Regions:
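Short acidic, glycine/serine/threonine-rich loops at helix termini
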Residues: 1, 57-63, 140-142
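Active-site-proximal alpha-helical scaffold in enzymes
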Residues: 5, 23-52, 92-122
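Proline- and acidic/polar-enriched loop/turn elements at helix boundaries
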Residues: 19, 51, 59, 104, ...
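Flexible glycine-/small-residue-enriched beta->alpha junction loops
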Residues: 36, 41, 45-94
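N-terminal extracellular/periplasmic Venus flytrap/periplasmic-binding protein-like
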Residues: 101-178
């Protein structure tokens, strides 16, 4: 239970509960929404919400195999374990969302993130976290460790442009959208 481990690791006493929300995408957002609801319903006064996301290992060929798949479900509903990429393809097809529209939305998202970070919109909501970053020199195969302080989401790309997005190849092959 990563939520419980995080609570204890942060120095909270053992009587403070922790829980995990398992979603392959948006678990952090869901954890925050659950916490906000607990406060709104006056069930809790203080809640810490966060997430641990890793969508790099949910595609079928790289799937984490430690989670079992129910054979009866697989027989009766074979798409029950559909990956997020496959799900996105279904949504894009069903609602006729073109590659161009997806690229425009992705660009807008990158720009909004950059703007919000640049203007400090989330500074009061994000607590800096000190951690150790592992770096690997590809040429020498040497591994280095660096103490860092994470103060914002590091994954946005402010230099993103529509041309760069349109040049990205679809993950599932040429006939796909995503």
């Amino acid at each position: 239970n990563i939520g419980r481990l995080a609570a204890i690791s942060s120095g909270l006493p053992v009587h403070v509960p922790g829980m995990s929300v398992d979603r392959q995408c948006a678990s952090g957002l869901m954890a925050i929404a659950i916490g906000a609801k607990q406060i709104a319903c006056k069930e809790m006064d203080i809640v810490v919400g966060g997430g641990v996301e890793s969508i790099s290992l949910v595609q079928n060929e790289f799937s984490n195999k430690y989670k079992s798949q129910d054979k009866l479900l697989m027989k009766n509903k074979p798409d029950i374990y559909m990956s997020m990429i496959d799900t996105a393809e279904v949504v894009a097809n069903r609602y006729n969302i073109s590659r161009e529209k997806q690229d425009e939305y992705a660009l807008q998202s990158q720009q909004r993130t950059y703007n919000a970070q640049n203007n400090g919109y989330f500074n009061d909501e994000i607590i800096p976290v000190k951690t150790t970053k592992v770096l690997k020199n590809i040429e020498s195969n040497q591994t280095f460790y660096e103490e860092v302080e994470i103060t914002k989401d590091e994954c946005n790309r402010p230099s993103t442009d529509i041309e760069g997005l349109s040049n990205l190849k679809p993950v599932m092959g040429e006939n796909s959208f995503i």
